[in-house]
């Protein structure tokens, strides 16, 4: 029986307040309005940015349904939708692409002005929610809201992908993989034969390592305080692994000594202010490029010696790897299907959706790279 045009009752993980576990609830999801799409989520990844909301370091309105990395199937569409149809496999886009704003039209920008990133309103574009639970409206997250069996997104926040693609794998392209991989190949523009360092070897960091290898880097140095991650880092392309706790000097000095003055490209993937500065300082003077990939806490400021930049180093930031969602995500899925890069090594756990809190526990304990939840 078709559910188009009807309110759908389904399971979702609601975060009622920060520093509390997710609560599996029955929620109501209303039909999509004009230029909106309702999606049945098949698989969704657990991202550290979601946990930043739980612990309060990223501020967004609560109660909310989080989640922003997923793959699903279009259930129904609102009036005026032309780019997807019911039955299409899709990836929701937490960085939308309207194709009309100045940012979308610029070849080097991917931060569409219609996105919720940075504004954290917790609604769709009309300022309202499509979710209710126990008679109360529930906030969206980043315009995609994937910790729900069904979600509603704007048409500009979803893109069609290859019908043969395995959603439990390509869902990683919806955030983590693209964020790391693109930071190397698209934003940093890693050069063949260069020396790279990646601070933190989690899922995004490992994706950056994959990108550095794909770009032809000669040396890729993984930096992490968890030695258990080094085997996976080397499997995916790291040539050397360094634990800062093994040294009695700052890690940027260690990297400078290892590389005759500094690396050509560095990637900070944790989101810590001290490691952001350290990643810049480990770069070679005159030409080194450091890319900030990790999401920093709200309302904090960097302090550093401006001579570090005046000496010729460059500092860049990367959201979603610099990719334009509608243009680039289908291409990345096609590249995965063509075996141009792996996703399987990044997935350490596949859990049923009801085990979402167990998945977050593994993330916090550093015992998973990526946990994928399936409905």
Swiss-Prot record:
Residues that bear N6-succinyllysine: 234, 340
According to the UniProt entry, which residues carry N-acetylserine? 2
What is the top-level taxon of the source organism? Eukaryota
Q: Where in the cell is it found?
A: Cytoplasm
Reactions catalysed according to its record: a primary alcohol + NAD(+) = an aldehyde + NADH + H(+); a secondary alcohol + NAD(+) = a ketone + NADH + H(+)
Q: Which cysteines are joined by disulfide bonds?
A: none
**Per the entry, which co-factors are needed?**
Zn(2+)
Give the co-factor note.
Answer: Binds 2 Zn(2+) ions per subunit.
GO molecular function list: all-trans-retinol dehydrogenase (NAD+) activity; zinc ion binding
Q: State the InterPro entries in the record.
A: ADH-like_C, ADH-like_N, ADH_Zn_CS, GroES-like_sf, NAD(P)-bd_dom_sf, PKS_ER
Per UniProt, the enzyme's principal EC class comes to: oxidoreductase
Q: Which residues are involved in binding Zn(2+) 1?
A: 47, 68, 175
Keywords assigned by UniProt? Acetylation, Cytoplasm, Metal-binding, NAD, Oxidoreductase, Zinc
Q: Which residues bind Zn(2+) 2?
A: 98, 101, 104, 112
GO aspect biological process, one term: retinol metabolic process
| Annotated EC | 1.1.1.1
Residues engaged in binding NAD(+): 200-205, 224, 229, 293-295, 370
Please tell me where this protein is predominantly located.
Answer: cytoplasm
Family according to the record: Belongs to the zinc-containing alcohol dehydrogenase family. Class-I subfamily.
Q: How does it assemble?
A: Homodimer.
Q: Output this protein's name.
A: Alcohol dehydrogenase 1
Organism of origin is: Geomys knoxjonesi (Jones' pocket gopher)
